[in-house]
Amino acid sequence: MQISLLLMQQIAQLFLILLMGYAVVKTGLLKASDSKVLSVVFVYLVMPCVVLNAFQIKDTPEIRTGLLYSMGIAVGMHVVFLLLNALFRKALKLDAVEQVNVIYSNAAALVIPIVQALLGEEYVVYSCAFVIVQLVLLWTHASACLQGSAQLEWRKLLTNVNLIAIAAGALLYLLHISLPAPITSTLSSVGNMIGPMGMLLAGMAIAEVPLKKVFCTPRNYLPVFLRLLGVPLVIVLLLWAVQASHWVPDGKSILMTVYLSAITPACATVTSMAQLYDRDASHSSAIYVLSTLLSILTMPLMIGLFELLL
């Protein structure tokens, strides 16, 4: 349970930063709309630096095996997500916004700083596997679901800066190209901002949402329960049933980096997509806010179960 306690401590630290972001808006120092500037820095500078730096590792058979393993697990998890969604959609009458919020997590922004703190910088590369799979599905399945059509956003997928950074990092890794020390130091320094900046943005976003409406609307709790507890519980039981942690050397730690991505709150990008496709963005925003706040309790709980079973 040590990892679970460390995770709780790390999430508590991130939550305090979230409160700072909330406070600067509520005190009138900034407007919630001012977060757009930080969002640009976060998406176009910080995240790519983290990804590029993650791939600056020695190419060994163990790492290659770990990458293939994490990618396979990530694909398998998303297949389960989609199957569960097909089941929940009809049984629970989930609308498109709720479905997409249940399937897609805020993995990129939240998991990477947690993995850095809990397991070390060398494990960040494995969390990229989940991000790759999610990005592909986000701009294909999720966009089609929100549009109510089969039209796919290939251009947005292929021009996504994080996917480009992953492709560039993977290419450098495969070609055994090590960047000069000043560059890797710069990437590391900028990348270290991912946790604080991500939570400041979350806090600023939460500040513009009426929390009374978020907490007092019963319907909000259904997709949040599925995202934080229902789906992660099914996933961890399946991983336990097939003993996935024993498939490769260091399997439990690598598996944890991928599982952490599956238990994070709803994806912030979904709310932006809901606005783009004229869906109920306020409902999506409420799910994001509620799931982000409740994940402080549920993530350590699910990791505790992961440690117990695997």
Model regions: which residues?
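Alpha-helical transmembrane segments of multi-pass small-molecule/ion transporters
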Residues: M1-L310
